[in-house]
Amino acid sequence: MQNTLADLKLIIIDEVSLISADLLYQIDRSLKTIFKRSQTPFGGIGIMFVGDLLQIPPVNGKYIFMPPYNSQYLVAFENYGLWNLFEAWILKHNHRQGEGGEWANCLNRIRMGIVTEEDLKCLQSRETDDPIHDLESMHLCYTNKEVQSHNSKMLSKVKGPLVQVEAIKKYPKGRKPRIKDDGRLEDLGVMDILQMKVGARVVMVVNVDTIDDLVNGATGTIVGIEYDSKNVVECVIVSFDKEGTGEIHKMQNPKYANKYKHVNGVPISREELEPMLKSKAGNNLGIGSKATIYQIPLVIFYACTNHKIQV
């Protein structure tokens, strides 16, 4: 590992709000072990975090700047506190919201702990006594399991036949796929068994082509499902919400692009993915332990977690 990373100088980690205090010290310990520099923070490797520390804390963890849960890291925290080694550079213009209007201004004040009377009225105007379970409403949930439950409920309301696509899984001898409570495979985001219908809302969970905007988080609606000569699902046709998404992809797949031109459909096929296999102790396995998964990188999207929606 040290030879592989011999030229490593800097690690950039995005979404700092998802990094717990314990994970910060795990990163420190791992780099010290790899580079055999036990007395130098992060083994002498530069670390740059990017993100928003005013977002909600990591799942089952503390904010990165707080004392870690694990007692083995507390000594290090009390002695030198890794977070104190960082220098903050604050970006002051919110490009995602743009000028944004009063709603964006309201959200920006709330994130700073400032709530005006008008802000409160704005939020309360969106309050409802009964849960909304129509196909146009997005629900925010705390866990992925709750998300999967709500997505399944909403999918059942979509008219038309249910189609299932099971992932093709190739694993080393003696290894089995790790399927999470919400039906996703490993840490890849894709479903072991993807259930869908024409007309269902979906979101991409893998970066297929960043130039073509076919990226993790791209949302749309299924407008068609195409099969091969063996009646196996070949691709899913998606009309994406963002104009221009998948234009290059359509040119590379003219067969279905022309057929679904009237709905701006983009064909999405199975992607080849490689999960990071780990030992029982949680360590990454080395050469000879490669696994491959082939699955359509979409999931039903009527709900998502609080953490997912804020990034």
Named regions from a protein language model:
Residues 1-310:
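Conserved ATP-binding/catalytic motifs of P-loop helicase motor domains
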